[in-house]
């Protein structure tokens, strides 16, 4: 019989400083925690956290998504986070507050929302 290969346990790399990218659209909030080079350590979304439909685009859903991404990244030994916020959605501030409450020291908050220099025509105004 053939020998079964010896399986070694994969060692998790220890990262002290990281970056949190919060993409807050009007429909959903995506939180990705990366290392300094941009390699993703963990991520979570409001939709993947159990919220569907209009509840997905609430600040509470963004808070839950940020908590889930933060707890998943704690096994890498993260202490400090630099936060990059993109988008106009309702979960911008609550995601940053949730990361702060998860025990991370937030060193810097940067808004990286893309602003067009008169590029594409925006969608028409809603008539409700």
Swiss-Prot record:
What's an example of a GO molecular-function annotation for this chain?
structural constituent of ribosome
The UniProt entry, under PROSITE patterns, shows: RIBOSOMAL_S11
**Cross-referenced SUPFAM superfamilies:** Translational machinery components
Might you report a single GO cellular component term?
ribonucleoprotein complex
User: Can you cite a GO biological process for this protein?
Assistant: translation
Where does the UniProt annotation place the signal sequence? none
TM segment ranges: none
Matching InterPro entries: Ribosomal_uS11 (IPR001971), Ribosomal_uS11_bac-type (IPR019981), Ribosomal_uS11_CS (IPR018102), Ribosomal_uS11_sf (IPR036967)
Which of UniProt's keywords are assigned here?
A: Ribonucleoprotein, Ribosomal protein, RNA-binding, rRNA-binding
- Keyword Ribosomal protein found: yes
Q: State if 4Fe-4S is listed as a keyword.
A: no
Q: What does this protein do?
A: Located on the platform of the 30S subunit, it bridges several disparate RNA helices of the 16S rRNA. Forms part of the Shine-Dalgarno cleft in the 70S ribosome.
Oligomer and partners: Part of the 30S ribosomal subunit. Interacts with proteins S7 and S18. Binds to IF-3.
> Which family would the database say this protein is a member of?
Belongs to the universal ribosomal protein uS11 family.
* HAMAP family documented for this protein: Ribosomal_uS11
**Listed name of the protein:** Small ribosomal subunit protein uS11
Q: Which gene encodes it?
A: rpsK
């Amino acid at each position: 019989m053939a020998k079964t290969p010896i399986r070694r346990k994969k060692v998790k790399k220890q990262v002290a400083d990281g970056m949190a990218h919060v993409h807050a659209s009007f429909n959903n909030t995506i939180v990705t925690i990366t290392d300094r080079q941009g390699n993703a350590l963990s991520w979570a979304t409001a939709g993947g956290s159990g919220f569907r439909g209009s509840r997905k685009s609430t600040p509470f859903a963004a808070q839950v998504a940020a908590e889930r991404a933060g707890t998943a990244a704690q096994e890498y030994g993260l202490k400090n986070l630099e936060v990059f916020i993109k988008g106009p959605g309702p979960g911008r501030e609550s995601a940053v507050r949730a990361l702060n409450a998860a025990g991370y020291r937030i060193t810097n908050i940067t808004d990286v929302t893309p602003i067009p220099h008169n590029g594409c025509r925006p969608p028409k105004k809603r008539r409700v």
